[in-house]
Each structure stands twice: as C-alpha cells, then as structure tokens.
C-alpha cells in the first residue's frame, strides 16, 4: 500500500546504515521462520520491519555506511592503510545540505500524495465541487509557490546550486500562486451564505499555508536521524581506535564495538520507529483523514421541566 511504501522508505532513510539494516532484516527473518505460530499481528509487524531492514541496507549502501566507518578504522588501525567503501550516491556527513534538500523533496511528495488521496476520496463520494475547491486549488497554489521558490536566492543558499527558469515559467508560477490563493479565499467558506463570513473563513483557510510549510520542514528529521546514526557509529569506532595495538587493545576494541553498536542500533531503531510513525499519522494523515463515529452522548434523563415536590415532616 501507499502508507507501507513510505513507511519503509522513510524508516530506511533515518537508520541509513547497511550493516544495521542487514542485522534487522536477518533477525526479523529468523524470528518469522522460527516461530510460525506467532500471532498474526506480530508476524505482520516482523515482516514490515524486515522490509524496513532491507530499506535501511539499501540506503546504507547509497550513503556508504557500514557500522559507521568501521572499514576505514579497521583497515587503518590494524593493516596500516585506509580502505574506504565508496558510497553509491553521496556521504551525508560530507554533504548534509544535499540530504536536507532531498529530505524536503521527499516530504513534499509525501504530502502531495496525501492531498491526492483526499481528492480521490472526494471524487469517490461524488463531491466534485469539494475536489476542485479543496484539492485542485491547493495543488495550483502550492505548485506555484514551489516554482517561485526554486529560482530564489534562499533556495540557492540551501541547495548550493542555482536554478534559472524562463521568464514565461516564472510568470506562470506567480499566476498559479495568486490564482490558487484567490480561489481558496473565495471558495473555502462556500457553505456559509454570509459573504463577509465566507471571505473570513476563506482567509483563515488560506492561512493554513503556514501549516504546509511546517509540515514540509518536519521532514528535516530525515536529515537529523540519518546523521545521528552515522555520527554516533563513527564516534564508537573512533573510541575503539584510540586503544593500543596489542591483545588487550584488540579485545577492548571488540567489546566497545559490540556494546556501542548494539546500543546505537537500539536507540536509532526506536528513533526511526517513532519519527516515521509521526510523519505518517500527523503530517500524512492530516491531509486527508477525517475521523468518523458519532458524538458521545452520556446516558442521562433529558428533561425540559422539573417539578420540585416539597416534603414536610411533622
């Protein structure tokens, strides 16, 4: 499903170490194979985390992370020359701003998919007007704003690259942003017959564009957790590398390696789990999900009039 794809995608990006991913995938596969009679919910969870482990392995290969930089440390400390396993894409520690840009890009795609699901639900229920006013107009305005942002100096300073659009595209972006904003102001309060209140509700709904900005920036946690995994792993390896090259040093190196990486894996597994859930249930679901059910009505006796009888005791 769409949700599981993004869950696995973001989980792997946050953990982003090939060795950690292999460990998670292997452990989950062994548990599923060894305990076939486990509950269905537990089996589904382990299968999900198996795919999360595979995703982590893929992201780790792309970023060149294998227990942090253990290959570099071991080759230099014990063999006298440095051997580096190159990243297939880039190393986040060397180019964090690039990872930030891609994190925001993936987050924007995730949010747009959520808005698209809202449009699908509107069309499914036959709400064509709602589809146009609550989905299409937002798409038009947001795409226009993004096209205005890309050639700006702000984006150039973050992405460390300059994008130049033709004048016609810049004009079209401004028209899309302005047209979408005007449409939202005029149509968001369409259920209200009072023109002034209708415009006020439309302006309030337009203010929700700041919510879109905060939701998009929330995906910067992909950068933060991805860097945290690699930095902590590298620190653990460096601590082991500070020991002398003798038998005791090797034994302590192995102990530090095992204990340190087990703790790092546990902490970052928890972090990836929590923050991936947050991106799904807060940012993603917030674009289309509407709670159902009925309003709570407590069990009570509803009366309009109350007769009070006064009892007198002699």
Stretch-by-stretch model annotation:
Residues 1-314:
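Conserved, carboxylate-rich catalytic/transport cores that coordinate ions
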């Amino acid at each position: 499903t769409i949700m599981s794809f993004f869950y696995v995608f973001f989980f792997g990006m946050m953990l982003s170490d090939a060795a950690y991913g292999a460990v998670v995938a292997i452990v989950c596969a062994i548990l599923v194979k060894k305990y076939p009679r486990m509950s269905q919910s537990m089996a589904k969870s382990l299968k999900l985390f198996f795919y999360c482990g595979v995703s982590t392995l893929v992201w780790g290969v792309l970023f060149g992370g294998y227990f942090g930089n253990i290959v570099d440390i071991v080759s230099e400390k014990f063999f006298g020359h440095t051997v580096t396993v190159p990243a297939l894409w880039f190393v986040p520690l060397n180019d964090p701003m690039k990872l930030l840009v891609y994190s925001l890009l993936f987050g924007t795609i995730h949010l747009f998919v959520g808005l698209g699901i809202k449009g699908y639900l509107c069309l499914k229920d036959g709400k064509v007007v709602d589809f146009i006013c609550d989905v299409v107009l937002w798409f038009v305005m947001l795409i226009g704003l993004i096209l205005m942002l890309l050639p700006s100096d702000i984006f150039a300073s973050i992405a460390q690259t300059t994008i130049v659009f033709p004048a016609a595209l810049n004009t079209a972006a401004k028209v899309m942003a302005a047209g979408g904003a005007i449409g939202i102001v005029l149509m968001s309060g369409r259920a209200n017959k009072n023109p002034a209140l209708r415009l006020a509700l439309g302006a309030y709904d337009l203010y929700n564009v700041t919510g879109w900005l905060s939701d998009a920036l929330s995906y910067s946690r992909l950068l933060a957790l991805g860097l945290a995994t690699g930095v902590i792993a590298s620190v653990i390896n460096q601590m082991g590398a500070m020991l002398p090259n003798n038998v005791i040093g090797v034994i302590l190196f192995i102990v530090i390696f095992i204990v340190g990486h087990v703790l790092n894996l546990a902490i970052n597994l928890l972090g990836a789990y929590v923050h991936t859930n947050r991106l799904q249930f807060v940012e993603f679901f917030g674009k289309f999900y509407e709670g159902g059910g009925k309003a709570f009505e407590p069990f009570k006796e509803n009366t309009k009039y109350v007769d009070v009888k006064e009892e007198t005791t002699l």
